[in-house]
Amino acid sequence: MGFASLLPLPAGADPLDDAFAQLAEPSGEGWRIAESDILRDWSRSGSAAMDLLLQRGEAALDRGDLPTAIGHLSALTDHAPDFAAGFQARAAALAMSGQFGPALSDLQRTLVLEPRHFAALTQLGAMLEEMGDPDRALDAYRASLAIHPHQQEAIDAVARLERQRLGTDI
């Protein structure tokens, strides 16, 4: 640990700024560590109880138990309304259950709380694409890639939508 990490941050500085700068680097492998650091930070609410609700909601989502996932994640967003990860996770569960309106609202809230939430932007792109809005989906994917240019899902989606736009989709 260097001495710089022991110094207080200037007022208004985000401790993730360095990680986001590393994430945006076009070459090298440092972005993988930065991505991991960012995702780990985003998954911490500051409350063990809220973190447990997130874990339970995500586990239910992984099992495909959407009602349970939505229940846990709704409890989380009710009790931790400033925790972006709760809204982003609930948006995934809502979208998987076909509730696109509420899912879009949750993604909007996620992005208000954390404008650099590249996962939410990629999720938004996928949802807009599924809803038949390829132009806005492309905008969301591109916004996500401006923050995190190494996301294969977003890279592939941009290429696919650009091919479709040009009429060369195969």
Region spans (language model):
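Canonical positions in the second alpha-helix
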Residues: 41, 75-76, 109-110, 143-144
